[in-house]
């Protein structure tokens, strides 16, 4: 039992754990890399996807939820990969029959995942342990409905659209009825009479009000006065905002260009070098770069890692491994990042701390740094780029379940 837990911890550090369900089985799978084709290949090795009707659909969810999302395109797989990168536990269900067994509903990518109610969570645990069939609809209808049960009701988007259309029609009818009531209940106008004596020396006022012959003309004067007041207030507020903005602009400090750096944390274990890269700069690191590590020995050697075609966004992490490496890490070792044109765009040295800040060399021009920023690489499941042999790190592990003597070795390629 202890050995199985130890193996599980080791496998977790080497990939992304997934719990996979079909109609009869449940097993734990370590996905080595966030690649849709590799994930499908790993599951397909266990002969769980093929049936008499062809390939079954795949669904996924974070653990302990009552609904699932289907995996069809890059957008769907991107959501799953985002959860796995955050070290969250996720489950994959194979086929609609499996969803029926575990009493799960299908939602769109725009809907949120819903938590299981206490009763559903208890039933789910019992079915996982005893592989029992889900509760029949008749038995479920006889249970008492709690007041909070409506909070987890799943409604299709088509049904919601119909609700919205009906609500809009109801709102239009209410507005029309309210307008009709105002017209029918309109009180008769009460004429207000009065006189204002204007001095004869104010000839402008006398001439202005002499031209007012009707109530409509008086209403126009009243409306123009209110428009003038509103525009005056808006101009005053905009003037204040502009003055505040100009004061703030004078206080803005320009960030010095030498503050941009790539942070690399180096570790050595099991005859391997691990480089965890964190993009702490203010720009995206383009793909097709190379990481060069040169030791500080008497006869220095350089190890090169191809960083792959994918770019590294701002505040994003990526980890690389170099195997084998049996030498001891020494202070003064050099780390360089080269772009696809062979130019060194970041440089740093290894010291007493495992964390190294890589900065652009002083000789690097702004044009060279700008040229290294390539457009975002479009990821497609059906058209994956060909991998260079120099950028492949191959490892073999065995996936097996309890009580199975036949182990199957899986080999993956990690960039």
UniProtKB/Swiss-Prot annotation:
Interacts with the vacuolar aminopeptidase 1 (LAP4) precursor and mature forms. Also interacts with AMS1, APE4, ATG8 ATG11, and UBP3. It is a peripheral membrane protein. One of its GO terms (molecular function) is protein-macromolecule adaptor activity. It comes from the Eukaryota. The gene is ATG19. It holds the Pfam family ATG19. A motif (WXXL) lies at residues 412-415. Cargo-receptor protein involved in the cytoplasm to vacuole transport (Cvt) and in autophagy. Recognizes cargo proteins, such as APE4, LAP3, LAP4 and AMS1 and delivers them to the pre-autophagosomal structure for eventual engulfment by the autophagosome and targeting to the vacuole. Involved in the organization of the preautophagosomal structure (PAS). ATG19 association with cargo protein is required to localize ATG11 to the PAS. It is found in: Preautophagosomal structure membrane. There is a cross-link at residues 213, 216 (Glycyl lysine isopeptide (Lys-Gly) (interchain with G-Cter in ubiquitin)). Polyubiquitinated at Lys-213 and Lys-216. Deubiquitination by UBP3 is required for full activity of ATG19. Residues 126-150 are annotated as: Disordered. The modification Phosphoserine is found at residues 136, 141, 243. InterPro entries: Atg19/Atg34_C (IPR024543). GO terms for cellular component: Cvt complex; cytoplasm; cytosol; phagophore assembly site; phagophore assembly site membrane. This is Autophagy-related protein 19. ATG19 is important for yeast autolysis which is the source of several molecules responsible for the quality of wines aged in contact with yeast cells. Present with 1250 molecules/cell in log phase SD medium. Residues 126-135 have a biased composition (Basic and acidic residues). Induction: Translation is induced by nitrogen starvation. Translational repression during nutrient-rich conditions is dependent on a uORF (upstream open reading frame) present in the 5'-UTR of the mRNA; it promotes ribosome dissociation. Translational induction occurs in conditions reducing translation machinery efficiency, leading to ribosomes scanning over the uORF (leaky-scanning), and increased translation of the mRNA. Changing residue 412 to A: Impairs vacuolar transport of LAP4. It comes from Saccharomyces cerevisiae (strain ATCC 204508 / S288c).
